[in-house]
């Protein structure tokens, strides 16, 4: 069974490991940099930009895969699935039109409005800077609501800024909106939304167009520094619990979050003819219940590493059920284990990361800790590893309790050396307790 994998980060490393648990799988990977972990698992690799559709086509023609799995969002936004399907290759991932659920935040908000999906919020999209945009930000403030400023398109998870966090006040928010128009960031359109108060969590679903099968809930940590301080990143690490929900969630929260995603899948069927692949909802748990911050059209990174580490099924079976519309016929099951994932990143990340610096990873020592290792934004050159500026290496602890899973992941970070740092507080009970207290406070 030949599988074409597109992408070369830690998320794709987790996908590669999950696929290779099936001995029939032969992996062929197209990625931008040489990820040593993925390269080892692959029969053949091609180094090219994941958005270079000509390179994808050429590699697919050569390999003739039975199935393709798409890791990152950028190629989905370029229409890589449309291309592969035209070539007669089934792909786990949405077509360009359906991928807009991530690649076009205005499309996502309008979908919620049109189909009256629960968990929506106040928003307005703008094509140019002007009085209307300024007034909307001021109107939110008058209602006691802070503004969130987002480019409408893709920015690699780093374009969102919030008043009271990255933006000091409304004047800075307006200035940032202006900057988005001037630089063309994320397509140069701006979405202004209300800031939600609460605790963030994520939920993934495997979708075949009709059926959605859910994974455990995961909590990501987007802030760069301990205690949830610093710049917003692509995610510094994440954890999941043995009971598959999060400690600050009620059964009602679980039910509502799943209903929102089910309604979204139905709406996408009506609007664009269906969605297949992985759907990843990023939620804010507010005192009114879960609300959607945004959707992603693929696995979360880091969350894929938590989820695929405890998936009981043969992942190939799940992928085949997605493309063959057979998800209703299988049970997707996960072990009742806790997982903690921690990223080791270059110093200065995300604002001013060191690039091209060497990093050393003692794989044997990490293996002895019991942790799972995934290489991310590194490039292997002549046997040495160099950081390329984004998150470098991830380690995952899996155990019966969060405390033990956290200890395993933390122990493993000691064997990664270089101009690097990580958040040691992810998965620690003090930080989780803070989240529980925040939710209790809001619910009072």
Curated annotation (Swiss-Prot):
It catalyses: 5-phospho-beta-D-ribosylamine + glycine + ATP = N(1)-(5-phospho-beta-D-ribosyl)glycinamide + ADP + phosphate + H(+). The keyword Transcription does not apply. NCBIfam families: purD. Mn(2+) 2 binds at residues 294, 296. Mn(2+) 1 binds at residues 282, 294. The gene is purD. The keyword Metal-binding applies. Pfam families: GARS_A, GARS_C, GARS_N. Its EC number is 6.3.4.13. Pathway: Purine metabolism; IMP biosynthesis via de novo pathway; N(1)-(5-phospho-D-ribosyl)glycinamide from 5-phospho-alpha-D-ribose 1-diphosphate: step 2/2. Residues 109-324 form the ATP-grasp domain. Keywords: ATP-binding, Ligase, Magnesium, Manganese, Metal-binding, Nucleotide-binding, Purine biosynthesis. Belongs to the GARS family. This is Phosphoribosylamine--glycine ligase. Mg(2+) 2 binds at residues 294, 296. GO terms for biological process: 'de novo' IMP biosynthetic process; purine nucleobase biosynthetic process. It comes from the Archaea. Binds 2 magnesium or manganese ions per subunit. InterPro entries: ATP-grasp, ATP_grasp_subdomain_1, PreATP-grasp_dom_sf, PRibGlycinamid_synth_ATP-grasp, PRibGlycinamide_synth, PRibGlycinamide_synth_C-dom, PRibGlycinamide_synth_C_sf, PRibGlycinamide_synth_CS.
């Amino acid at each position: 069974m030949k599988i074409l994998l597109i992408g070369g980060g830690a998320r794709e490393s987790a996908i590669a490991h999950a696929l290779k648990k099936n001995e029939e799988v032969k992996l062929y990977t197209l990625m931008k940099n040489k990820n040593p972990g993925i390269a080892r698992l692959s029969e053949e690799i091609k180094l090219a930009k994941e958005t270079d559709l000509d390179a994808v086509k050429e590699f697919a023609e050569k390999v003739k895969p039975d199935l393709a799995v798409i890791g990152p969002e950028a190629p989905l936004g370029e229409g890589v699935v449309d291309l592969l399907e035209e070539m007669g290759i089934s792909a786990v991932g949405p077509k360009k039109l359906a991928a807009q659920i991530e690649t076009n935040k205005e499309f996502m908000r309008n979908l919620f409005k049109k189909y009256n999906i629960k968990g929506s919020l106040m928003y307005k999209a703008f094509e140019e800077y002007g009085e209307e945009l300024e007034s909307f930000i001021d109107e939110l403030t008058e209602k006691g609501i802070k503004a969130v400023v987002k480019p409408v398109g893709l920015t690699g998870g780093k374009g969102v800024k919030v008043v009271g966090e990255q933006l000091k006040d409304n004047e800075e928010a307006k200035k940032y909106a202006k900057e988005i128009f001037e630089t063309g960031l994320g397509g140069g359109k701006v979405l202004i939304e209300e800031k939600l108060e609460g605790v963030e969590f994520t939920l993934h679903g495997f979708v075949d167009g009709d059926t959605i099968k859910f994974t455990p809930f995961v909590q990501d940590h987007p802030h760069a520094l301990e205690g949830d301080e610093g710049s917003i990143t692509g995610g510094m690490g994440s954890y999941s619990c043995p009971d598959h929900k999060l400690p600050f969630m009620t059964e009602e929260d679980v039910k509502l979050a799943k209903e929102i995603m089910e309604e979204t899948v139905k709406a996408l069927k009506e609007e664009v003819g269906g969605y297949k692949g992985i759907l990843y909802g990023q939620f804010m748990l507010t005192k009114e219940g879960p609300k959607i911050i945004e959707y992603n059209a693929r696995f979360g990174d880091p969350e894929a590493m938590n989820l695929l580490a405890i998936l009981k099924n043969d992942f190939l079976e799940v992928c085949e059920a997605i493309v063959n519309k057979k998800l209703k016929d299988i049970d997707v099951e996960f072990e009742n284990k806790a997982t903690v994932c921690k990223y080791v990143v270059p110093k200065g990340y995300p604002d001013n990361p060191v690039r091209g610096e060497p990093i050393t990873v003692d794989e044997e020592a990490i293996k002895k800790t019991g942790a799972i290792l995934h290489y991310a934004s590194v490039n292997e050159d002549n046997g040495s590893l160099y950081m390329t500026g984004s998150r470098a290496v991830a380690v995952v602890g899996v155990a019966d309790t969060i405390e033990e899973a956290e200890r395993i992941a933390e122990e493993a970070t000691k064997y990664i050396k270089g101009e690097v740092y990580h958040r040691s507080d992810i998965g620690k009970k003090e930080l989780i307790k803070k989240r529980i207290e925040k939710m209790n406070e809001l619910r009072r």
